Swiss-Prot record:
Protein name (Swiss-Prot/TrEMBL): Cysteine--tRNA ligase
Keyword Flavoprotein: no
UniProt cofactor note: Binds 1 zinc ion per subunit.
Keywords from the UniProt entry: Aminoacyl-tRNA synthetase, ATP-binding, Cytoplasm, Ligase, Metal-binding, Nucleotide-binding, Protein biosynthesis, Zinc
Source lineage: Bacteria, Bacillati, Mycoplasmatota, Mollicutes, Acholeplasmatales
Gene: cysS
HAMAP family: Cys_tRNA_synth
Organism: Onion yellows phytoplasma (strain OY-M)
Position of sequence motif 'HIGH' region: 30-40
Amino acid sequence: MLKIYNSLTRKKEFFNPAHPPQINMYVCGPTVYNHLHLGNTRPLIFFDTVKRYLEMLNFRVYYVVNITDIDDKIIENALKNQVLEQDLANKYIKSFNNLLKTLNIQTINFKPQATQYINSMIVYIQTLLDQGFAYFTDQGIYFRVSKIDDYGKLKKQDLSQLKQNARKQLDPQKEFPGDFILWKKTSQGITYPSPWFAGRPGWHTECATMIEQLFKLPLDIHGGGTDLKFPHHENEIAQTHAHSHQKLANFFMHVERLDYQNQKMSKSLGNIIWCKDLLKQYNPCIIKLLILSTHYRKPINFSYDLMEQAQQKYQKITDFLTKNNFYLKVNQFSCQALDQDIMQLFHQLMQDDLATHKVIDLMEQTIKQAHQTQILDKLSQFQNSLLLILNILGITIPFNKPTKTDLQTYFLWQDARKYRDFAQADILRKQLLDKGFI
């Protein structure tokens, strides 16, 4: 049975969805003020695999990734480039969708945009005001975290500990340093009318509102990068409790950072690897192998040496599938069976907190096993199992498949060897080698 590490309880727990076979999963997506870097894509690649595996277990997964298309960073970048905020956001939404397609991340059911839910956010905030969980300052409307008894439970800190790191200096009228903005009063950039004053919603409120609009609570899985644990997910939990007196999610899953040069990969630090640039050098499958070769709760320190290792793994898998498939074809052998031992191991690894890194090791071990046998039935089962596992990882390897002419070339090569026509045999052998068949 599947066990998942729950960030809320800080332990692995058996995964029991609220309404099986339905599973509701919400993952925080990008703020579209620039292209996505490699660190941004790590959660997207991982949760794509999560959905694929849950569907393999015969669950029906409704998977939502939101798009933050109104934000101070968008406004700042739009002003800098002298374009409209929405035009800038649309440009990077298109870039985001193109990247998902290139990386074969096609399992997302819906990508709501924050600007589509402004009216719902206004109603949501008014409810918080009516219930005493929010208050006004000259700068906007804030959430009163002191009214949430267990605020800080995701971060495992109480209010006194959180107070030390909070930023009261941004608004001296805040009742508590950790109170966060629900509706920002501003005239800069795009603003929206409200019953109170023109402004725009706070980021934490955008997600909390969209989740309640799209799902029956609690979510089965709420995911994102580890940097979202606090304050973003903590503040979503607080708002949901205050607004609807419900639990936001049964499981919180957080994907660790992807660093570069031993620092967090960040646009603000300028130490970023843009995915669009990396894809000019590497096949998308290699990027996915890099990401999935480390457990999602362990950080990755990106280097081009790691990329080369992932490329070598990709090449080993490609070479095996090409040669093995050719061997089965020339022997006119085909079956749909899977290797039960391999699949049992695969499920054991995935059901222990989705250990994709060990699954990739399993694939490499399977290829080594295959090199030690010529039994057609076994080789076919190895290949079928590998292809199924690769599909769950969202990796499609376009290995060479022989045509009738290629098969004829093989038999002509065998005849040339048999009749000791070595010159012709060398020519035919080279043709097969060039295509990776032998």
